[in-house]
Amino acid sequence: MPTGGFDINELKRRMQGATQSLKHELGGLRTGRAAASMLEPVQVEAYGSHMPLNQLATVSVPEPRLLSVQVWDRSMVKAVEKAIVDSNLGLSPATEGQVLRLRIPELNEERRKELVKVAHKYAEATRVAVRHVRRDGLDTLKKLEKNSEISEDDQERLAHEVQKATDATILEVDQLLAAKEKEILTV
């Protein structure tokens, strides 16, 4: 079937990119549980430049509320400790040799509600991005049909596919949000 250069898979890729971004943003929201991903944004001043923590140490979760950071180079322990303290994550490392232990404090009810609001904001921004992708796709289809590059039937069929992809992506966003909300509110 002629699609006049219209690629539904490209639209789906753009929509998936938005949900991947949401997953990353939601992963950065600190819940009461320890997760190695909490330290992904930490940059360490090392060897004359800023390096991601995961290039200098191994992060593990030995207990649900404890992170363990095993620094590979003994000379970098202080720099890693400073980077974690300066990261605004609210974590205070306890250093034992080349291992830093980070206790994850309990979240109070007010902070949990704030985090849920932030998660909702991220999800809404993702929904808006997905709708923009849908609008771009539908505009392209209208142009192609207007220029007689595709038939009206093809335009309607492809528009229906675009809507199906949008609905599926929005559903995925809602599921990601619900899971994160449950994780945040679980004491």
From Swiss-Prot:
It is found in: Cytoplasm. Keywords: Cytoplasm, Protein biosynthesis. InterPro entries: Ribosome_recyc_fac, Ribosome_recyc_fac_dom, RRF_sf. One of its GO terms (cellular component) is cytosol. Gene3D superfamilies: 3.30.1360.40, Ribosome-recycling factor. SUPFAM superfamilies: Ribosome recycling factor, RRF (SSF55194). One of its GO terms (biological process) is cytoplasmic translational termination. Signal peptide: none annotated. GO terms for molecular function: ribosomal large subunit binding. Responsible for the release of ribosomes from messenger RNA at the termination of protein biosynthesis. May increase the efficiency of translation by recycling ribosomes from one round of translation to another. Belongs to the RRF family. This is Ribosome-recycling factor.
